[in-house]
Amino acid sequence: MLLEHAFGNYRDLLEAVTRHPVMGDYLSMMANQHADPQKNRFPDENYAREVMQLFSIGLYQLNQDGTPLLNNGALLPTYSQDDIENLARVFTGWHLADKSNGSWTSKQGDWFQAMAPYADKHDSDEKSRYG
């Protein structure tokens, strides 16, 4: 997967990484479901946080020269907890492409194909980004 996207664009690489079953399992996005407050179930925020912190904009705003942007000496964050919660809702409903065993919690299936979307597990409500 990395070999295929090593010299391509960032968007395609991020999509391939996001849909890869090993990444989905490692950062707990695989089998992530839409919220159900009655069952005290909420989307897992782990992958959303890593996308923001490690794979894209980082923790703090930067000047063009890479130095931290400050406000009265304080670092300025690039995103909020609300941003993470909304992005976590985007990353719901993904699982192994072959779920022929029918179990949402099982990790048996095809680990060589990109994960597939499952609409009944996805948060289909409106989402906002960055405030």
Where are the predicted features?
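Active-site substrate-binding loop specific to GH73 endo-beta-N-acetylglucosaminidase modules
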Residues: M1-G131
